[in-house]
Amino acid sequence: MVTYAEPNMFNNLYPPAGGYYPNGGVLNNIADRLLWQDPETLELHPWIAEDLPDTNADDTEFTFHIRKGVTYSDGSVLDAANVKKNYDLYAKGDDSRMLTPSEQLPNYVKSEVIDDYTVKFYFSEPSPGFPQSTSVMNQALLSNDTLDLDDTGFSPGHATDISGSGPFVIEQEDMGTKLVLKARKDYDWAPPARKDHQGPAEIEGINVVLAAEDSVRVGSLVAHQSDIARQIEAPDEKHLKDKNLQVLAAPTRGVNNSYHFHFRHPLLADKRVRQALIHAIDRDNILSTLYSDSYPKGSSILARTAVGFKDQSDNYAFDPDKSRRLLDEAGWIPGEDGIRVKDGERLSLTFNESVPQPRSREMFTKVQEMLKNIGVEANLYPGDRTAQDKAMKDQDSVQVRHSMVGRANVDTLATWINGKGRNSFLNYDEGTDSFGDPKLQDMVEEYFSLKSEKERLEMSGRMQDYLSEQAYILPLFEEPQVYGFQPYVEGFTTEAIGRPSFYAVKINAEERQE
């Protein structure tokens, strides 16, 4: 058995919730997908599908031929009817069971079972990104009985009820502290393109243990109490390497770790204020003092490794004198305590703490001092992850949002911006049914109407230009998932956006004994 130290335990194993890394880290090892995305080349290959899909001319219809002989851990068969049931649920959700739809399946109309092992998907608009979406955690395939569960059934306390077709099965759950994954001895349907391993997993299983404190995860590695640990903080990377431990910084290839501004809030409605915030933050100082070379400085809202990246570096230079001039021009005058005021109101902004992101609170502390230097008060919203997630959706609670998204797909940016989807900028207000910036939403809708990936890549570049021109975001760094592991661990990899894969892991017994 391999012991894996995780900073956060899963909170939901419903695949559309797999974006949260602790959720995706479990799903990646217990559930398969139609296609497999090579984490190095990002090329798509058959997995549960026998081949890449047959598509029509405008990418609105996709036909998959399903591999025969695949079974779920509960003994049921993975066939076309089961694939249909998976995708119909993920695309549409089910309000009665509190199951939300996947944001990665926009414009999904229906699926159709052609025969026992052939399924066809229909979309109302061109969807060239759909094949890649079939390779990700949010569309992980689960058994029919599992798909009948409600939100509670996918939540902590019910993990052993989740049945996937992956190389591991959840055997035991100690709620909130431990998860035991056991290897399936009959697993024999890995992606044929995988060169590192085929057949059942090499290891017997994985003990996923909660180690919330950074020092506990590092200490467990140094003391040989764990074999692999996730979220090794930057100051600890060198320490582990000095102890002859391995460190892997896996890219997440999507929306960078960034601050983005809820621009409908009155304090951030003036573009000059947003620009002032951007130019007041010294990212080089933050990266050199809190992070390591594993965290490249952000050059756009998208990572350099992301599909569709376009360099925007010139928009984010550190220039606090420019910040002060911009605030002066916008009518914000320093008050008695140095914090700027206008019409009797203080320029006081609240940031969220992004609990899953590395060193979010420490970074805020540095940013707080930098903004104070130009006369802006910065406050940190209090509370745990649940409280933070709720506050981020309310511009009166949080005006500057700290977050990121890992996803290796050209649709990532448009999905992230979409006011009728993720609504990351809170551009759409449901109460008034209005957009603060209609042009931004128009760009999203135009994007999803485009038929070819080339057109979408060009539009992604235009959206990046627009976000920079409007000063809606400050990209901080390209966030990796950093793992530490023992020298005797071989074959440990991640999928395309950094979630752990234990399938090909081997233990060098001789080195382990030493």
Predicted regions, residues:
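N-terminal lobe/hinge region of extracytoplasmic solute-binding protein
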Residues: 3-57, 88, 163, 497
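Detector for C-terminal structural segments
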Residues: 28, 174-179, 281-314, 321, ...
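Aromatic- and charge-enriched surface segment that lines or borders ligand/interaction sites
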Residues: 51-96, 114, 120, 267-269
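Ligand-site clamp/hinge motif
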Residues: 156-159, 187-239, 377-379, 384
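Surface-exposed binding/hinge segments that line
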Residues: 65, 101-148, 167-174
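Alpha-helical secondary-structure segments
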Residues: 79-85, 118-122, 126-130, 166-167, ...
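Extracellular/periplasmic solute-recognition and catalytic clefts
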Residues: 92-93, 98, 111, 171-182, ...
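Gly/Pro-rich hinge or "lid" segments in bacterial periplasmic/extracellular proteins
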Residues: 38, 43, 136-205, 215, ...
